[in-house]
């Protein structure tokens, strides 16, 4: 089964908690703090495996949770960091945030990695908070929560050659002839509903990967007939082989077919019209095909490469393979990265995924309570051990240093009012 798009949920591992401990050895009267730090939580990492061709593994498992770091121990022993959770994906996988639609990673080469969900850092033990004024702190820090997000995995096949054309023009038949691929072939439209890949070898020992793509129809660039899903796989092909039914057996004019498909390639706005193209005039064994080919050559530009073939009698197949291989030899490496002029926040590629540290916001609940939210304050809230009075006092100092107290006063918060952070309730005290 070919799966080329799936949405999954990721949860990176939380950092381990730091602990509060003291040296208690004999003959050490002023032992001091000895609480170790927690270990780092595991990150969720995607890695390219060139042996994979589909996202099938993600169809049945949609939720991935990385391991938590170990807690710190006494004697200043740090907890062990958790090993990263590595998820294998095929070459050509794009990872997008469901929330923002930003491209988080574009994985092309074998072994290429991308950290998509960062594991939380370990909480600090009490020995980290020792100061001359407080040489024996009696509080520690919880581990930082790991990042949690939903992402969409989108596969764009990395094939050298893409077969495009209307349904039932012979694309699957051609692939089955020139490679060992066994695509489904039938005498009806849209027999092929998922791309098929095949490795093609020429008699002079040149080889390339050919993709048989589902048939396109007018309006495909606007999504008609699942056009976006099909055209997506053309984006990363170096050469486009445009197959046309030159016999007109479906009642369509070959030149009209040629214009319609090329119009869809232009409208898709991924520079597909700039790719080298070879026109394959198929079904030359049928009546009227030769006359149609003569007229077709008069209608198209002289620079268009046209190879007449018959996938039934297998005429000129070898000549076609040589033409494709020669065209690939001429093509330079194509930069498949996202255009710089595309709208930021929609198709922007982020080469380094870092956590955002936005400012806090203050809102009011229906009962009049003040609600403080923001990445930084919520992170501190989760890392505070509220069972420890010194840790609670430290959290209050952090809120003051961030300016939250002053901001609450400006919003009208007074003595005794309720302040909420992530479901926790506090009483505002002047």
From Swiss-Prot:
<dbReference type="InterPro" id="IPR006073">
    <property type="entry name" value="GTP-bd"/>
</dbReference>
<feature type="binding site">
    <location>
        <position position="172"/>
    </location>
    <ligand>
        <name>Mg(2+)</name>
    </ligand>
</feature>
<feature type="binding site">
    <location>
        <begin position="310"/>
        <end position="312"/>
    </location>
    <ligand>
        <name>GTP</name>
    </ligand>
</feature>
<dbReference type="GO" id="GO:0000287">
    <property type="term" value="F:magnesium ion binding"/>
</dbReference>
<dbReference type="InterPro" id="IPR006169">
    <property type="entry name" value="GTP1_OBG_dom"/>
</dbReference>
<keyword id="KW-0547">Nucleotide-binding</keyword>
<feature type="domain" description="OBG-type G">
    <location>
        <begin position="159"/>
        <end position="329"/>
    </location>
</feature>
<comment type="function">
    <text>An essential GTPase which binds GTP, GDP and possibly (p)ppGpp with moderate affinity, with high nucleotide exchange rates and a fairly low GTP hydrolysis rate. Plays a role in control of the cell cycle, stress response, ribosome biogenesis and in those bacteria that undergo differentiation, in morphogenesis control.</text>
</comment>
<feature type="binding site">
    <location>
        <begin position="165"/>
        <end position="172"/>
    </location>
    <ligand>
        <name>GTP</name>
    </ligand>
</feature>
<dbReference type="GO" id="GO:0005525">
    <property type="term" value="F:GTP binding"/>
</dbReference>
<feature type="domain" description="Obg">
    <location>
        <begin position="1"/>
        <end position="158"/>
    </location>
</feature>
<feature type="region of interest" description="Disordered">
    <location>
        <begin position="118"/>
        <end position="145"/>
    </location>
</feature>
<keyword id="KW-0460">Magnesium</keyword>
<dbReference type="InterPro" id="IPR036346">
    <property type="entry name" value="GTP-bd_prot_GTP1/OBG_C_sf"/>
</dbReference>
<feature type="binding site">
    <location>
        <begin position="190"/>
        <end position="194"/>
    </location>
    <ligand>
        <name>GTP</name>
    </ligand>
</feature>
<feature type="binding site">
    <location>
        <begin position="212"/>
        <end position="215"/>
    </location>
    <ligand>
        <name>GTP</name>
    </ligand>
</feature>
<dbReference type="InterPro" id="IPR031167">
    <property type="entry name" value="G_OBG"/>
</dbReference>
<keyword id="KW-0963">Cytoplasm</keyword>
<comment type="similarity">
    <text>Belongs to the TRAFAC class OBG-HflX-like GTPase superfamily. OBG GTPase family.</text>
</comment>
<dbReference type="InterPro" id="IPR014100">
    <property type="entry name" value="GTP-bd_Obg/CgtA"/>
</dbReference>
<dbReference type="InterPro" id="IPR036726">
    <property type="entry name" value="GTP1_OBG_dom_sf"/>
</dbReference>
<keyword id="KW-0378">Hydrolase</keyword>
<dbReference type="Pfam" id="PF01926">
    <property type="entry name" value="MMR_HSR1"/>
</dbReference>
<keyword id="KW-0479">Metal-binding</keyword>
<dbReference type="GO" id="GO:0005737">
    <property type="term" value="C:cytoplasm"/>
</dbReference>
<comment type="subunit">
    <text>Monomer.</text>
</comment>
<dbReference type="GO" id="GO:0042254">
    <property type="term" value="P:ribosome biogenesis"/>
</dbReference>
<protein>
    <recommendedName>
        <fullName>GTPase Obg</fullName>
        <ecNumber>3.6.5.-</ecNumber>
    </recommendedName>
</protein>
<dbReference type="InterPro" id="IPR027417">
    <property type="entry name" value="P-loop_NTPase"/>
</dbReference>
<feature type="binding site">
    <location>
        <position position="192"/>
    </location>
    <ligand>
        <name>Mg(2+)</name>
    </ligand>
</feature>
<dbReference type="InterPro" id="IPR006074">
    <property type="entry name" value="GTP1-OBG_CS"/>
</dbReference>
<feature type="domain" description="OCT">
    <location>
        <begin position="352"/>
        <end position="430"/>
    </location>
</feature>
<dbReference type="InterPro" id="IPR045086">
    <property type="entry name" value="OBG_GTPase"/>
</dbReference>
<dbReference type="InterPro" id="IPR015349">
    <property type="entry name" value="OCT_dom"/>
</dbReference>
<feature type="binding site">
    <location>
        <begin position="282"/>
        <end position="285"/>
    </location>
    <ligand>
        <name>GTP</name>
    </ligand>
</feature>
<keyword id="KW-0342">GTP-binding</keyword>
<dbReference type="GO" id="GO:0003924">
    <property type="term" value="F:GTPase activity"/>
</dbReference>
<dbReference type="Pfam" id="PF09269">
    <property type="entry name" value="DUF1967"/>
</dbReference>
<dbReference type="Pfam" id="PF01018">
    <property type="entry name" value="GTP1_OBG"/>
</dbReference>
